[in-house]
Every structure is written in structure tokens, then in C-alpha cells.
């Protein structure tokens, strides 16, 4: 299970320490690549399963999260490639999450200076899912060997909405993130 992650909350034009891109990519993408690389022979030998706990931001960009979204896009592309290359010997599952209560991901997110922002941005909690409910759904999906798991389930519409209702989707996401900034 690939579950490493560090987030950010800063507009790209407000970033004062560009090294936060390297830091986020090193954890979110390269850390997962390193884990898969170290275990690939064993996974192939035992018809193993790779499960990536990721985010809806792997499917599209998101305001205030340029480095985070980019790192999750990279991970998504890497795992999709593995599925094509090794699909007969290993299984790859992606779990796309929305906001989850109780993870401290937001408190540990990096701000424009590359430092943790702390508890200053938690307005999304009314939209967030309980961590126990989330883990139950993840386990159920893994047991069923699902290739894609969306939590909450409405996230499954993102690829469709991005393709056919792009402007509407971008306006909706911009509205949600601007509410958090105020």
C-alpha cells in the first residue's frame, strides 16, 4: 500500500521557496516509486497487488496545490504504466480520496515558504469524510480487487465532468477553494 503524502496550500505565484516542489515530489511520487522498485520482484512472483492511496487531485489540477497535484499526477501516470506493463502479473488499484477528517494532512501542508501551515485551514471539515468510514471502504475495495475506488463516490464523476463540463467543474472547484481562503 502506497500511502505517503505531504500537501501544500499556496498559490503558485505566492510561493517564496520553490524547493517545496522537490520536497513534495520526493515524498509523494519518488517515495512510492522507490517502494515499488524495492518490491517489484516479489510482487511479480506472488501476483501481488499495489494499492495507491491518492487523491482526486491526481485526476485534475487544484488551486493552491500545484506541486501536490503535479506529484499525484506523476504517481497516477507511473501506476497506469505499471498496470499496462505488468498487468498479467500484478494488480494495481488507485484509491482517490476527497477530504478526510482526522488525518492532519491539512495541518502538515506546506505554505508558500515551504513551512507547515498548521491549523489555519480547516474549513473543509463539513465536507470531509470520517476516517473510520474511509478505511472501511478502502478495505472493502481491496478485498474485491477493485482497480479504482472513489471516496466519496461522487468523485467518480470527475473524469467525465472534466471532459464534458470543464468550465463548470473549474468554477466549482475555484469557488470551494476561495471559500477556504476567506
Feature annotation, model-predicted:
Residues 36, 71:
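Active-site helix of classical SDR
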Residues 38-47:
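A short helix-coil junction within the Rossmann-fold of NAD(P)-dependent oxidoreductases
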Residues 55:
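Residue(s) in the substrate-gating loop at a strand-loop-helix junction
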Residues 60, 81-91:
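Active-site-adjacent segment of SDR/Rossmann-fold oxidoreductases
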Amino acid at each position: 500500500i502506497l500511502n505517503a503524502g505531504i500537501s501544500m496550500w499556496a498559490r503558485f505565484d505566492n510561493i517564496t521557496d520553490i524547493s517545496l516542489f522537490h520536497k513534495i515530489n520526493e515524498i509523494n511520487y519518488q517515495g512510492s516509486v522507490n517502494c515499488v522498485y524495492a518490491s517489484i520482484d516479489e510482487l511479480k512472483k506472488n501476483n501481488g497487488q499495489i494499492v495507491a492511496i491518492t487523491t482526486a487531485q491526481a485526476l485534475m489540477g487544484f488551486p493552491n496545490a500545484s506541486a501536490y497535484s503535479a506529484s499525484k499526477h506523476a504517481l497516477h501516470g507511473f501506476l497506469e504504466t505499471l498496470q499496462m506493463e505488468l498487468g498479467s502479473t500484478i494488480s494495481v488499484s488507485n484509491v482517490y480520496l476527497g477530504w478526510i477528517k482526522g488525518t492532519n494532512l491539512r495541518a502538515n501542508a506546506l505554505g508558500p515558504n515551504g513551512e507547515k501551515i498548521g491549523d489555519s485551514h480547516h474549513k473543509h471539515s463539513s465536507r470531509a469524510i470520517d476516517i473510520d468510514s474511509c478505511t472501511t471502504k478502502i478495505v472493502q475495495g481491496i478485498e474485491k480487487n477493485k482497480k479504482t475506488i472513489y471516496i466519496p463516490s461522487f468523485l467518480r464523476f470527475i473524469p467525465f465532468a472534466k471532459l464534458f463540463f470543464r468550465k463548470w467543474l473549474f468554477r466549482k472547484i475555484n469557488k470551494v477553494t476561495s471559500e477556504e481562503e476567506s
